[in-house]
Amino acid sequence: MTLGFWIIKILATTLGETGGDSVTMSMNLGYAIGSFIFLGIFVVAIIAQIAGKRFHPILYWMTIVATTTLGTTMADYVDRSLGVGYFGGSSILLAGLVASLAVWRWSEGSISVNTVATPRVELFYWVAILFSQTLGTALGDWMADTNGLGYEGGAIVFAGALAVVAAACYCTAISRTLLFWAAFVLTRPLGATLGDLLDKPVSHGGLAISRYLASGILAALIVALILLIPQRAGVYPGGRIREEEEALEA
């Protein structure tokens, strides 16, 4: 993974927060309806992504954003509408992530993204990503809302944790697969707290920026970086996701 990949990933997770809140809060559609809307978008995106014979950067990142927006609304629904709270919601979602990775490993023998070379394995990949995004949202809300850290403090904590994972990648022999999934989960609460910092009212510790404006700016930044960062196409078979990682070279 390169720095360019992770910068776009953090922007995508932040967009997932502001975009999800735009539908559920600004449009006042609620968490359940918002989740159904984003579920539909996610299903369409993942079908197109898996059906593609080559790597399409815009499509790949659209699918990532679809998982972050759906993760936002699903986490809010589980935590708030179902009344299980942040701890209960995070526990349920963690169990879902572990189960999805366990089934993937049991079926294919590995959960490394370097093995994603068939549509079936790619489906495992996207299901695990969806659980990781939803879990990350719940963790971000839990940290910011219940520990007195606020959005800025929560963002600093998760940025620090992400830095530790990055250091471990260069300084230890810890499994790169484990570090990848740890980083993938941690970018989500970082983006969630940054998104809340942007659009929540000043009285709640935010900057009160319009959710629509924040989402538009974030989307524009993502598109600009996708176009600016050199990317190479991958073809089945041979590990399309792996080539997606290698393509994002800053």
Where are each of the predicted segments found?
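Polytopic alpha-helical membrane proteins, predominantly small-molecule transporters/carriers
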Residues: 1-250
